[in-house]
Structures are given as structure tokens and as C-alpha cells.
A protein has these predicted regions:
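Bacterial Sec-dependent N-terminal signal peptides
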Residues: 1-24
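Beta-strand elements within well-structured catalytic alpha/beta cores of enzymes
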Residues: 25-37, 117, 181-188, 205-206, ...
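Short, structured active-site-proximal loop/turn typified by the sulfatase FGly-forming signature C/S-X-P-X-R
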Residues: 42-82
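His/Cys-centered metal/cofactor-coordination and adjacent catalytic loops
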Residues: 44-53, 68-70, 89-111
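Catalytic-site neighborhoods of secreted/periplasmic enzymes
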Residues: 97-160
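Non-catalytic, well-ordered alpha-helical segments in soluble enzyme domains
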Residues: 121, 278-282, 289-323
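Active-site His/acidic residue clusters
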Residues: 139-151, 169-215
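Histidine-centered active-site microenvironments of extracellular/periplasmic hydrolases
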Residues: 235-277
Length: 327
């Protein structure tokens, strides 16, 4: 009888700390909105009506980086300023202009944080990607990494881009049925309509993506596997031109390029932004000033939150996590 009484406190402590340990496990949903400019996210009275959920969560329960009017700067470190290079930098934490200089379907020689997480026993078979753009599987090098990337559909806005609504539904299905600990979601209609000069459809796509993010968050809040344990990080792969205007001469940066364009000669194309909220994010609201944040810091930030070892092929990190936003 006495040994049993002595064991009771120990059993109680094991139950309490075992529960707390489980609760401490972090899950992440990383969302990219292709080619959405910081101006649409941060400028003017329209911002609260255009992206109400990002503002509700980022301002009150998280952080927002990239409002250049407040001297908060985020940008890509690569010199290409296009989607493949932006996503590779975002997810791999390195720049590789030597090998990545266009949007062709080539297998990425760099390893993404998703691939590194998948290689860890804690995340084995618990990492997924869902994308609207059919180049994402190559950026994640799904042939080498064997990551499950959901991107196929007959419902498409173009040959390479499927409807974002399909991507949302597939992402929700993945959350509910597969319970990944790390999920990457990529929406692409903003960039598609931007390139085609359809301003209202570009804005509609941005607003729609905001509502999609709300649905993904609410899905997580209704599931004990995610509730209280999940961090959302939303960002973009590149910026766009700043205004209407003529093209620059060959080799010059065009400071008056149309918002429909992006690339290494289009001023503003390197400018990005980030909104984060959830379990591991400090409540800093809309941030001001400070050092420039680079898109290559996103991957090590994800790795830091999930406690995934993160180094490049030389066993040295190229970029550090965005420590100031982390709890």
C-alpha cells in the first residue's frame, strides 16, 4: 500500500508534464500569396476591407512586416526577382542565382525546409504542400524529396495555374484527413491577374485569399491537433512594378514600370512582406523601422519554430531566423 501511495505523486507529475510536453509541440501552416505587393497589404483605407483577417490577426495577435511607409522593410536577397527564385529563397533559405534565373520547370538543387523536416523522425510523413502553380513541385524537388505536393486539377485559370478555390479545398482536406505538422499552401491568382493587367480581379483574388486564410485558421481552431499549437506565417515570393510607365532601356532599372510586371530591372519587384500569428509569434502588431528582413530568413524561422536542424550543404546557415518576432 505504501509503495502505491509513493507512486501517486510521480504518476501525477508524469501526467501533467506529459500533457504539457505534447501541448508544446508546434505545428505550422505557411502560406504564400504569389506576387501580391506590399502596397495592397499596407496602404490606404482599403487595407482593412481588402484583407480584414490578416489585419485582425496581424495587428492584434501577431506581427506585420513590410510597410515601407513605416520604414519596415522586407525584400528578396536573390537578384532575379521572379517566382521560382523567390519561392526557392523562401523555402530553402539560400539564394542561388547561378542555377535559378527563370521560371522553367527544373528540379531545384537546393533542399527546402519541408524536405529537411520530412527527414526528421518527428515529421516523417507529416509534411505536405498544396499549390496553385504547377512549378511548385519542381521548386520542392518532389522527385528527390518525395514530398506529397497537391497541384493537379482540371479547374484552372491558365495552363499552369489552377483555381485558388481548388487549392483551398485541397488544403482543408489535407488538414482534416492527414494532420500534417507542417503544411505549405501557395495561392497564385493574384500574380496571374496581375500579369494580365486585370486590376479588379487582382484585388478580388487578394481579398479571396484573405478569406481562405481565415478558413484555414478556423479549421485549425476546431481541431484539437492544431488548436493552441499552431503558427501561421503568410508572405509572398516577390513584389511588382510601382506604377504605369514605359520600359527602361536595356540594363537599366525601370522606376516607372507597370504594376503588372516584375523582374530584376523592375523597381519594387524585390519588395516583400510577412504576416505571422499563432503559438510561437510575439504580439508586436504592425512593425516600424529596424533592419531589413530578407525572404531567405523565412526558412530558418520555420525551422526554429519546429526545432528542425537547418544548415546548408556547407553545414552553415546562410540566414538567421527572424528572432524578433519569435516568443
Amino acid at each position: 500500500m505504501i509503495p502505491l501511495l509513493l507512486l501517486l505523486p510521480l504518476l501525477f507529475l508524469l501526467a501533467v508534464y506529459g500533457k504539457d510536453s505534447k501541448k508544446e509541440e508546434s505545428r505550422m501552416v505557411v502560406i504564400a500569396i504569389d506576387g501580391l505587393r506590399w502596397q495592397e497589404v499596407f496602404e490606404g483605407a482599403r487595407r482593412d476591407s481588402l484583407m480584414p483577417f490578416l489585419w485582425e490577426m496581424g495587428r492584434k495577435k501577431g506581427c506585420m512586416i513590410g510597410n515601407r511607409n513605416r520604414k519596415s522593410k522586407m525584400e528578396v536577397a536573390n537578384g532575379i526577382w521572379k517566382s521560382y527564385a523567390g519561392y526557392s529563397e523562401m523555402l530553402c533559405g539560400v539564394t542561388d542565382d547561378e542555377h535559378i534565373f527563370d521560371n522553367c520547370k527544373q528540379y531545384n538543387p537546393n533542399r527546402s525546409v519541408l524536405e529537411l523536416a520530412e527527414a526528421c523522425s518527428a515529421y516523417k510523413d507529416r509534411v505536405n504542400a498544396v499549390a496553385s502553380w504547377d512549378v511548385i513541385p519542381y521548386i520542392l524537388n518532389y522527385r528527390r524529396s518525395e514530398l506529397p505536393v497537391d497541384f493537379r486539377s482540371s479547374h484552372r485559370v491558365s495552363k499552369q495555374v489552377r483555381n485558388d478555390s481548388v487549392t483551398l479545398n485541397r488544403a482543408l482536406k489535407t488538414l482534416r484527413e492527414k494532420h500534417p505538422k507542417l503544411l505549405f499552401v501557395e495561392f497564385c491568382e493574384t500574380d496571374y491577374y496581375g500579369h494580365h493587367g486585370k486590376w479588379q480581379k487582382y484585388l478580388n483574388a487578394a481579398h479571396q485569399n484573405d478569406q481562405f486564410i481565415r478558413q484555414l485558421w478556423e479549421c485549425c481552431q476546431q481541431d484539437p491537433f492544431y488548436k493552441g499549437n499552431t503558427t501561421f506565417l503568410i508572405t509572398c515570393d516577390h513584389g511588382r512594378g510601382e506604377s504605369l510607365g514605359a520600359h527602361a532601356n536595356r540594363g537599366e532599372v525601370d522606376s516607372q514600370a507597370s504594376w503588372t510586371e516584375h523582374g530584376k530591372r523592375i523597381k519594387g519587384s524585390n519588395q516583400t512582406w510577412l504576416v505571422a500569428f499563432g503559438k510561437d509569434i510575439q504580439h508586436l502588431g504592425e512593425m516600424e523601422g529596424g533592419r531589413t528582413i530578407y525572404t531567405k530568413q523565412v526558412a530558418p524561422t520555420i525551422a526554429s519554430i519546429l526545432k528542425v536542424p537547418f544548415t546548408n550543404d556547407d553545414n552553415q546557415p546562410e540566414a538567421s531566423p527572424i528572432y524578433k518576432i519569435l516568443k
